[in-house]
């Protein structure tokens, strides 16, 4: 029986062609293969990967395998899988469980499958959003007697998660506890997952070391900002074919993702307004030339609404009922609770096409909801370009190597890769875009207190 679940394995040839192109745009990952391939630093690592199953992720998976790892993979979002990418990886012999448009029940079943190594126990997690880590740690707590944790689900997602935990406990008593003990470490890709890790550590519930990949400069200041700058408008266009020039767009949040999103919409000609709770980010938005407003003041007039905050209930039902006819509502934060989609379930829904729904309000006005409030750049398009993802995923590879080869040196907690590796990741991507670095003279380096080779900035420097 085939150890994979994909939409159509016949898509593998198409996926391989796109994967080959992506490799030419991902110099960091290819450099990792060249540098570390001979030494096989991940030999013995059994990595459970939960991250969007895209063409770019396929290059990451094959890099991890080239460095000696055994890998099983699922997507971290029900809409983000590129089916031809999943097929290419499955055809190459990697167990992958990912289908674009999978149900929430299937999502958690597939998350369970990435831990089911036929030989040996999973000992590493590569996570995006923290669901794989959550699954193991929550299950272990329930096995320890905290059954109240899964007694009262508050969402459809929790219903499916809790049912999957119960199913695994019946099939394999004690499995979660054994699995938790075997994990040497986790590397986390995104802001939301990092928040979860810090919260777990604060509560004394993180039993192994974790590397916060998101806050590597070459991730958050590039993937989050420049990636969103290209992929947000791509998703809106593919979903709606609407002309954005002249439209009023509201971006909720002005962190790195919000900055990239606002720039994306401005570049398309939209008149962009920003909402913020943080006075520093609000001041940045204003000085970048955006009008900073509260949502209630613009909700009736704007054409496009995008959430980027990582928080819950940012756009609520009362906001959507005030929106103009055919307003577009979407999210580019990791989870689907930034928009109160559950509150819309009793309204009239008309599916326009995959991941595009028209919802009628009691007033008769309609809104266009993208990807059911999940990541629209991956649900309605194909996510960030390969080049920027190369920087993010090179950090992931380095984090996995660090945890696997030096895990004994780390106590449970959340760590960041050293500045020297951050600069290395950036350096690996310069030649591809024709960048030439100036070299400090020894006297200049001494004058500013650094070495000629770097690192060039202190750990507290804010890029």
From Swiss-Prot:
Q: Which SMART domains match?
A: AdoHcyase, AdoHcyase_NAD
Class of this enzyme: hydrolase
Tell me its EC number(s), please: 3.13.2.1
Protein name according to UniProt: Adenosylhomocysteinase
Which terms are listed as keywords in the entry? Cytoplasm, Hydrolase, NAD, One-carbon metabolism
Q: Which cofactor does it need?
A: NAD(+)
One Pfam family for this entry, by name?
AdoHcyase
Say which species the protein is native to: Rhodobacter capsulatus (strain ATCC BAA-309 / NBRC 16581 / SB1003)
For this chain, the annotated S-S bridges are none
**Any binding details for the cofactor?**
Binds 1 NAD(+) per subunit.
